[in-house]
């Protein structure tokens, strides 16, 4: 007679084993209708699964994150059901959930077209609208293998052969005539899976191995209701408009080309933004008492073997040879910073030493993963390494966190998700050391008044870390900042300092990145601002234009005055109508357009418009120069009189 304890502490006793759904029915018909699955003793279970002993139970509905993930997973099965009806010879591989959706890898002897995808989606909806029950059956390993052998599914057979113990009892989910295998749970009925959209097809190797066959990966998104789906598709449309690759081309910021995959060709305007970011971060480095250094571009293999990179990171490192020596182009800056620390004897009185670099790094990322500025092979890290004692961890991390928020707020990022990753099973150092390290990070987060999510076991083997993910205007998360403790690398590279008792001790190293990759950060802010960069970042801050040729000399004088004030200004003296010029520079997202006609010349002024079409009136050149200089100096996000 199981006793079921519900989340509110109330209990229900049954005279026989009961399923999750039966408990929901006992609570109420409305809850039963909404039940997707349950969490039994903290473990997700299907609605049909039977509870035989006393247990805690939470009912999972479409309102829960878990419920939404289950809907998405079941939509992957629905996709399998539909494609099998339309293309009976297709072979099904894997169909997991991903952020906001799902995919299914399929093996088909023809390339799927957009018309095919539309037909599959239509069939999925037709099937889901029949509201059929999903039937779960536990079978022996051999029964599962026989089932898929009979159905001609070699990939399912391979999963059984290579990933599932012979003693296991796999779960087969029956969608009418279609059968799939999964850990589950899945929806009990397809009425939960009627708000989805198939999005695209891409290539994907079986098992992610380029030596295996290339499959077709069909991506989709799924939501709990029509409103959520519509809102998500609207966000996708907005994201497409904000795509940094599209805006980067329109604004002539940069380009990529096949001869240098994953490497950026910065054009003048994009490089201007890049240098402004560097200048801004440098002011913060000075404010937070960092020294700036520059390490070599590549180092001998011997050093990378000492750090462990050669053994664990070789696939991502570019290498070259010279005079019978093998070198690796650096994928990160930390080993070089330890070499700088090692020059000269250090005392505990010298610590902490905060060492920053705009380091040019290269990683041999797979070509299929490259994506504009967001995923590149050559990038500039704004990282730093702090060498300190264990006693200084909390205060140094506190300072790092303060710096992270200080910098992010300048760009308008105030919604930041914070995660603390703790000790993994495989780690170096004693439990006491990890206790102190994790406590130090937690105390620093508390000192800054931050809420955070704990990621158990997600720390690196050499130390715990804090991650900072920016949430942008579309609700997307971008993981940029990290504060990582490292108890391993300084020791591997023989870094020591003279302690207060005259013994030699190994310093703790704190890895600290804020923007992360400058290239990627430019991609992020390009999409966040939709190319409407604040005045301090805008490549051209103002364009001065004439109405007729008679104002050309005055325009040149205005440009000189503003340029001499340190502003980035251009003249537009083309023989075009002023309305045409305004439209063109508006499309180029230039913050301010200054029009000079005979009236403005007579008054010694300029008529000022913004890129959003606001007419700000007339100003003397000196007045406008002071306004724009103040905006740049204070790094304001909005233009004059902009809401």
Swiss-Prot record:
Reactions catalysed: tRNA(Thr) + L-threonine + ATP = L-threonyl-tRNA(Thr) + AMP + diphosphate + H(+)
Residues reported to bind Zn(2+): 334, 385, 511
Domain TGS, first and last residues per copy: 1-61
Any GO molecular function: threonine-tRNA ligase activity
UniProt-listed InterPro entries: aa-tRNA-synt_IIb, aa-tRNA-synth_II, aa-tRNA-synth_II/BPL/LPL, Anticodon-bd, Anticodon-bd_dom_sf, Beta-grasp_dom_sf, TGS, TGS-like
An example Gene Ontology CC term for this record: cytosol
EC code(s) of this entry: 6.1.1.3
Catalytic: region residues: 243-534
Enzyme class: ligase
Reported cofactor(s): Zn(2+)
PROSITE patterns for this protein: AA_TRNA_LIGASE_II (PS50862), TGS (PS51880)
Cell location: Cytoplasm
Record keywords, A-Z: Aminoacyl-tRNA synthetase, ATP-binding, Cytoplasm, Ligase, Metal-binding, Nucleotide-binding, Protein biosynthesis, RNA-binding, tRNA-binding, Zinc
GO biological process, one term: threonyl-tRNA aminoacylation
Pfam families named among the record's database cross-references: HGTP_anticodon, TGS, tRNA-synt_2b, tRNA_SAD
Keyword Manganese in record: no
Principal localisation: cytoplasm
Cofactor binding remark: Binds 1 zinc ion per subunit.
Functional summary from the UniProt entry: Catalyzes the attachment of threonine to tRNA(Thr) in a two-step reaction: L-threonine is first activated by ATP to form Thr-AMP and then transferred to the acceptor end of tRNA(Thr). Also edits incorrectly charged L-seryl-tRNA(Thr).
Family: Belongs to the class-II aminoacyl-tRNA synthetase family.
Subunit structure as annotated in this protein's UniProt entry: Homodimer.
HAMAP family: Thr_tRNA_synth
PANTHER family named in the record: THREONINE--TRNA LIGASE, CHLOROPLASTIC_MITOCHONDRIAL 2, THREONINE-TRNA LIGASE
Protein name: Threonine--tRNA ligase
Gene of this entry: thrS
């Amino acid at each position: 007679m199981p006793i079921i304890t519900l989340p509110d502490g109330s209990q229900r006793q049954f005279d026989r084993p009961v399923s999750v759904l039966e408990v929901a029915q006992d609570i109420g018909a409305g809850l039963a209708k909404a039940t997707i699955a349950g969490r039994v003793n903290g473990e997700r279970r299907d609605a049909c699964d039977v509870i035989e002993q006393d247990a805690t139970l939470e009912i999972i509905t479409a309102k829960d994150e878990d419920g939404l993930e289950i809907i998405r997973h079941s939509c992957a099965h629905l996709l399998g059901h539909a494609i099998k009806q339309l293309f009976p010879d297709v072979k099904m591989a894997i169909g997991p959930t991903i952020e906001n959706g799902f995919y299914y890898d399929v093996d088909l002897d023809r390339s799927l077209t957009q018309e095919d995808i539309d037909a599959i989606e239509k069939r999925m909806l037709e099937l889901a609208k029949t509201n059929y029950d999903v039937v779960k059956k536990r079978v022996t390993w051999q029964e599962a293998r026989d089932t898929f052998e009979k159905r001609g599914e070699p990939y399912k057979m391979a999963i059984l052969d290579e990933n599932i113990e012979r003693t296991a009892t796999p779960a087969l989910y029956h969608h009418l005539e279609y059968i799939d295998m999964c850990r589950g749970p899945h929806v009990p009925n397809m009425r939960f899976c009627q708000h989805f959209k198939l999005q695209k097809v891409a290539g994907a190797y079986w098992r992610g191995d380029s030596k295996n066959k290339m499959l077709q990966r069909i991506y989709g998104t799924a939501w709990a209701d029509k409103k959520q789906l519509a809102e998500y598709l609207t966000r996708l449309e907005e994201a497409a408009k904000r795509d940094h690759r599209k805006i980067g081309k329109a604004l002539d910021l940069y380009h990529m080309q096949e001869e240098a995959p994953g490497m950026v060709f910065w054009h003048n305007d994009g490089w201007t933004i890049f240098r402004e970011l560097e200048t801004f971060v440098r002011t913060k480095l000075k404010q937070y008492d960092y020294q700036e250094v520059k390490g070599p571009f590549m180092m001998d293999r011997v050093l990378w073997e000492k750090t462990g990179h050669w053994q664990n990171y070789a696939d991502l490192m570019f290498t070259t040879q010279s005079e019978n020596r093998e070198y690796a182009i650096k994928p990160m800056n930390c080993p070089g910073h330890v070499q700088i620390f090692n020059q000269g004897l250090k005392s505990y009185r010298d610590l902490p030493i905060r060492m920053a670099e705009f380091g040019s790094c290269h990683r041999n990322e797979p070509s299929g993963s490259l994506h504009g500025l967001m995923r590149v092979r050559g990038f500039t890290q704004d990282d730093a390494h702090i060498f300190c004692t264990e006693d200084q961890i909390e205060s140094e991390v506190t300072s790092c966190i303060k710096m992270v928020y200080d910098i992010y707020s300048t760009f308008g990022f105030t919604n930041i998700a914070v995660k603390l990753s703790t000790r993994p099973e495989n780690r170096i150092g004693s439990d006491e050391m990890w206790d102190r390290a994790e406590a130090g990070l937690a105390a620093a987060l508390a000192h800054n008044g931050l809420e955070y999510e704990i990621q158990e076991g997600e720390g690196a083997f050499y130390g715990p870390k804090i991650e900072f993910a920016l949430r942008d205007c579309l609700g997307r998360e971008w993981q940029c900042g990290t504060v990582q403790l490292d108890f391993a690398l300084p020791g591997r590279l023989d870094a020591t300092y003279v302690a207060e008792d005259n013994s030699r001790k190994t310093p703790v190293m704190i890895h600290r990145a804020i923007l992360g990759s400058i290239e990627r950060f430019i991609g992020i802010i390009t999409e966040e601002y939709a190319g409407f960069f604040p005045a301090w970042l805008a490549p051209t801050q103002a364009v001065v234009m004439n109405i007729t040729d008679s104002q050309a000399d005055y325009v040149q004088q205005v440009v000189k005055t503003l340029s001499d004030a340190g502003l980035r200004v251009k003249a537009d003296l083309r023989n075009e109508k002023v309305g045409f010029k305004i439209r063109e520079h508006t499309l180029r997202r230039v913050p301010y357009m200054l029009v000079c006609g005979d009236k403005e010349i007579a008054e010694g002024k300029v008529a000022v418009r913004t890129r959003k079409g606001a007419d700000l009136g007339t100003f003397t050149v000196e007045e406008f120069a002071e306004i724009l200089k103040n905006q740049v100096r204070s790094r304001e996000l909005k233009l004059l009189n902009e809401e």
